[in-house]
């Protein structure tokens, strides 16, 4: 009876839960973004070996956010977390122009995964505060986002340490998930 009431309450008042994966190469800023969204502050981070998972309540959606390590040796295990995922936040270090090609390859490999076919994609072009950072148009071109035809996606310029662009991206994500596109 309690579960039935909770579901009815959620459907009337628009509460929704969503499983979100935060993916990207190592040192892109994934963990900084997770804790900026969850706690509203920058925390000191170390490379993620495995994953961090936190709940972020935003705009009547309870996001269960999984931040997965981005090191080369960990990326093959990302697929273990794909089932039941409604959205992917792909974080790119916009200042790491040497690895933008690798970021593109990993991104397009994710898009090909059957278990993520229905997931919407939010791209954070992170580290906009650093010299030489590519803007969102350049990251769009580098990742070949124009090739994405079969799903909802958006890109936002972000600076995780300053909190810039993160909530604009979360607004887009929550609105997209609420509208049933995700």
Curated annotation (Swiss-Prot):
Extract one GO molecular function annotation from the record.
Answer: GTPase activity
**Localisation per UniProt entry:** Golgi apparatus
Matching SUPFAM superfamilies, A to Z?
P-loop containing nucleoside triphosphate hydrolases
Query: Its GO CC terms?
Result: Golgi stack; plasma membrane
Q: Could you tell me which residues are lipidated, with the kind given as N-myristoyl glycine? A: 2
Provide the binding site for GTP: 24-31, 67-71, 126-129
Coiled-coil blocks: none
- Gene Ontology biological-process annotations: protein transport; vesicle-mediated transport
Stored Gene3D superfamilies = P-loop containing nucleotide triphosphate hydrolases
Extract the Pfam families matched here. Arf
Arranged from A to Z, the UniProt key words for this protein are: ER-Golgi transport, Golgi apparatus, GTP-binding, Lipoprotein, Myristate, Nucleotide-binding, Protein transport, Transport
Family membership, please give it.
Answer: Belongs to the small GTPase superfamily. Arf family.
What does the record give as the function of this protein? GTP-binding protein involved in protein trafficking; may modulate vesicle budding and uncoating within the Golgi apparatus.
Q: How does it assemble?
A: Interacts with GRIP; but preferentially when bound to GTP.
Protein's name in the database: ADP-ribosylation factor 3
Question: What is the native source organism of this protein?
Answer: Arabidopsis thaliana (Mouse-ear cress)
